[in-house]
Amino acid sequence: MTAAAVPLRPGPGPLPLLLLPLLLLRAGPVRADSKVFGDVDQVRMTSEGSDCRCKCIMRPLSKDACSRVRSGRARVEDFYTVETVSSGTDCRCSCTAPPSSLNPCENEWKMEKLKKQAPELLKLQSMVDLLEGTLYSMDLMKVHAYVHKLASQMNTLEESIKANLSRENEVVRESMRHFSEQLKHYENHSAIMMSIKKELSSLGLQLLQKDAASVPGAPPATGPGSKAQDTAGGKGKDSNKHGSVQKTFVDKGLPRPPKEKLLKAEKLKKEGGKARFPQPTAKPRALAQQQAVIRGITYYKAGRKEMTEAMADNALKGTSWLEQLPPRVEGRLPEPNSAERDEAGGPRASEAADLAPGTPASGPTLTPTPTASPLPTEPPSRPEVPSPGREASCEGTLRAVDPPVRHHSYGRHEGAWMKDPAAKDDKIYVTNYYYGNSLVEFRNLENFKQGRWSNMYKLPYNWIGTGHVVYQGAFYNRAFTKNIIKYDLRQRFVASWALLPDVVYEDTTPWKWRGHSDIDFAVDESGLWVIYPAADDRDEAQPEVIVLSRLDPGDLSVHRETTWKTRLRRNSYGNCFLVCGILYAVDTYNQREGHVAYAFDTHTGADARLQLPFLNEHAYTTQIDYNPKERVLYAWDNGHQLTYTLHFVV
C-alpha cells in the first residue's frame, strides 16, 4: 500500500487519524463510467494487469482546516492524502485526484484573488474550472476505442450487404431468364390453342348445319328464322313476311360471312327452335306471340338493341303478374319512355294482327290484350330471379334472423351496398352516404375488401336515401327531386322515370339522416317493389301509412291490384325488407338490440305483430335489403357491411 501526504503550513495540535473513504472503485479492464459534463469524479483510478484489484482512499481537507490555515492557526493534522490499495499477482494501480477536490482552500484563495484583481473574470474562472474538471473526468482513449470499434462494425456490415445484394441480383437475373423462357413456351402454347379453337369452331359449324339439315320436314337452314317459322305452323303469310329478310342474308350470291356470325345465327336459330318445340300444337297463338318477340330482338335497330333484349327477356320469362295486368287507361299521363315502348311493342301488335285475322286492328293505339292469348301451362324456361325450386320455399314465413356476419368496413356512417339478384356475376355496387351522384362497382367481394373498384358511374343527377337496388342491369333509385328513376348501367343513360301517384314526401330536404329512406326499393322472388308513405283516409289522427306496391321494371308504373296499404305508420320503424311477398319491419335502427316487430302478407292482405330478435351490431343501421338469389339480408351498419342469414317456417 502506498500513501502520498501533502503537508500544509505548520500549526500546533495533535494529528487525529481521520480516514474518509469517499469513493470505492473496483478495477477491471477499463475504469468505471465517468459522467461527461456532469458532476466531476473526485478520484481517478487506473489499473493494469490480468489479476488486479484496486481501491482508492481519499482524505480531503476539511473546511475548518481551511479556516485555520487562513487565520494562521494550522495544526499538524491539517493535510490531505490519496491512498492506493492494490492486491493480486499481476496488478499495477494508481489513484490521482485534482487539487480542487482535495484542497478546497485553493479554490477559495483563487476566488478571493479574482474578486480583488479582476471581478469580471470571476465568471470566466468558474467556466474554466468546470471545463477542466470535465476534461479530467473524460476517458478520451475509451471514446476513441468505441469509435474505432463502431467504424469496424460498419465496414463489416457494408461488406455483408454488398455480398447479399450481389447474390439477390443473381437470383433476380436467373428468375428473369426463367420467366422469359416460360413466356416463350406460353406463346407457343397460345398459338396452338388458337389453331385448336379455329378447328373446333369449324367443326361446330358443320355439326350445327348437319343438325339443321336432319330436322324432319324442315327446309335447308338458310337463316336464323327459318326453323322457327316452320315450327310456328308454316303459314304462308308469316313465311313470306320474313323470307325476304332471310334471303338478303344468305340465299343471294354475296360473300360468305365470317364463321362467328354463322355461329351466332345458328345459335339463335337453335334457341328459337328450342323455345317452340316443347309447346303443344293446340296453342298456336302463344307460340306466335313469343316468335314475334324473338324476331323483334333480331331485327331492331342497334341503338335500342339492349333495351329491346331486356323487354323481350321479360316477356319470355313469363312472369304471371305482368300477364294479368288489365289494359292501360287512356286518360293516363304519357310516361317519358312511351316512345320506346311504342317502338318495342310495334312488331308484336302487327304480328298478333297477322296471326289473328278475325280481330280488328286498332291502328296506332297499342292497347295490350292479355286475355286474347292463353297463358302457357308449362313453367317458364328462364325464371326471373331464383331457380324453380325456390318458389316452393316461399310458402314459409320468417322464423329467425341470425346474428350478422361482417365482411368489410368501408365508407361513411350512412350508405348502401347491394348485388344484382338477376345477374350471373358477383358484382357489388356501393353508394357511399345518403345522397350523391356516384355508384361504385366492384368485380367481387374480394376486390371490395381490397378497395379495388372496377367501374364508377357518374349519374347526371343526384340520388337521395339508401333504399336503392340494382336489378336486371339497372340502378333503381329516388332522385333528389320527387322522381323515381331507372338508370341503365349498360348504356349509361336514364331509361325511365316516374312519379308515384299518392306518395307523401317530407316537408323539407333531409340534410341529416332520419332513420330510414322515405322511398325504399326492394327485390324479392316475384320482382321489383317500392315501399313509400302515403295518406291514409281511414285515420285522420295518423294520416300517413306505409304503402307496398309492385313496380313494372320497364316503365316504373304501379297498378291498383298490386298495391297494398299497410297499418305500419310512418316514422314508427327503423328499416324494412321484403321476402317472398311479405313485408317485415325492424322497430329500431340506432339500438343494438332490436326486433322484427311487424309483418304484412301481400298474399292474404293480413298483418301481424312479431318479436323476432334482430341485432344491430354497431347500432346505426341505414340499409337492409333482401337478395333473393342468395337468400340473405344485406345491411350497412355505421360504415360496416354485414349480411344476415334467414330461417323460415315451411
Swiss-Prot record:
- Extract the coiled-coil ranges from the record: 163-188
Summarize what the UniProt record says about post-translational modification.
O-glycosylated but not N-glycosylated.
Give the UniProt subcellular location, in the record's own words: Secreted
Entry-linked SMART domains: OLF
Instruction: Give the start-end ranges of region Disordered.
Output: 214-289, 318-406
Q: What is this protein called?
A: Olfactomedin-like protein 2A
Instruction: Name the principal localization, coarsely classed.
Output: secreted
Locations of Basic and acidic residues compositional bias? 249-274, 329-345
Instruction: Tell me the classification of the organism that encodes this protein.
Output: Eukaryota, Metazoa, Chordata, Craniata, Vertebrata
- Record the organism: Sus scrofa (Pig)
Name of the gene this protein is made from: OLFML2A
